[in-house]
Amino acid sequence: MAVFVISAGSITEQNGLITAHNVTGKKHKELFMSENILFKKYTPQDYVKFAEQTANWIKTTGKIGKTGKLWLQSPDSKENFDDYPMLTPKSLYGGSAGVGLFYLRLYQVTKNAEYLDEAESAAKEIISTYEGKAFYERTLNLKATEDKLVHVKNMPGWIAGFNNGPTGQAYFILKLYEITKDEAYISFARKVADDVISVAKTKDDGIYWSEQLDYCGDGSYIPYFAELYRITKDEKYVDAARKFGNYLLTKGKPAPNGGTYWNVVDLTIIDFPKDVFWVNLAHGTSGVGFVFALIYNLTKDEKFLNAAKEAAKYIQGIAVGDENAVLVPYLDSLERGPSTEFYYLSQCHGPAGTSLLFHALYDITGEKEYFDWVLKLSRGIIKAGAPENFSRGYWQSQALCCGTPGLLEHFVSVYKLTGDKEFLEYAERTAKTVVGQSFVEDADGDIYHQKNARRWSGAWWRTIPTDVHSYTGLYIGTAGNAWTLLSLAAAQNGEKLIETVEYDFFK
């Protein structure tokens, strides 16, 4: 019991019951002190509630397509995203496939058929408007644009790849098949993979599709082939992965500090200096190494495992930190060395993404070195001041790709790997930050209460911090924030849910 002395007497508190006394000891009145909402420690039920509030907001952005459902990529932006890489209407990254995947996961958690209906409506639109091989024939031969803000349009491999193109959409539909067992879904998923393979270019004993060989470009087809092989056991998907791996092996070069690096994207196309190259997932060596690990899992060919290990050695050779915590620079250069004053922290370009390579190698080899590096990279995020403090490469994007939700997904994964409460505590801290960055409007005519719809607004472009919008999508915006809250709730409850493809291969 706490006693508070006041000028006219005292106040006592016990079990939330407040009693005021005057100087003679006589009680004035009794009040019940309710729990302060800002002091609350969130529970799994809270995270599910927040996710359902998110679904309510996304519903307000819905629109009818030719046969099914789409959602506005950003209802408060005036930009046209129809040909905007990563944000095209049906993309997994920022379009309807990602929103549909979120609704499917929410259906798993709640068993509310309305969410499954939303997911299936998204799938119907994707399937009915699929272009087939014509999409690749058009996309992989696009002419360059001079628009400097969107010069990612000059990267055909990214436009055709998993995050933006049909394979990412088909991943969502493959997950629908796993839950519903509707044969139409697996048929579509196979059709998409077969079309990708049919348009591959052949060189020596390998295949490729574009000049962008990274995990965002040609390399992104490999996790999709791996997913499809797991279900169908069709060896043609293994064969395609092997052939691409053979081609990718030829692009590696010895690194000055050990290991092998892969510079597989020409960054001058997007106005970077010609001497620099990216290091981390999704565009650099750690992403390539992750692809090699997946190819090894499919083929059991040791040369691909060795390549993944070489990629890890390169990352270890340029990492900066101590025995407990490290970060990996954003850029490297054979002329200037690594950018030791510039670090991203989340999934794209940061330790949340690069740790996937070490996690995969630990799963394959059981070697403690790789396990330890997962922990070092994870602790590096915390030592950098995240999740609460932002920095040059960790800004308020509110994106699963490059913001706080990407950290939450990572910490949940490391907690599941280790069972260590240290990483659960990191996840819970990060979840509080994620929730704290969301916005819920005041109820109409009632400032004491709020509406039941939650969204996030962020600056997707690191270099344009004032370009803030609410995005609906999975990797760019609101759906992704709620997705990661469901990840934490599932980990706390010991439940298994569908995963994004990056986390779908771990034991």
State what each model feature region is:
Residues M1-A2, M33:
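Accessible peptide chain termini
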Residues A2-A8:
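Extreme N-terminal basic, low-complexity initiation segments
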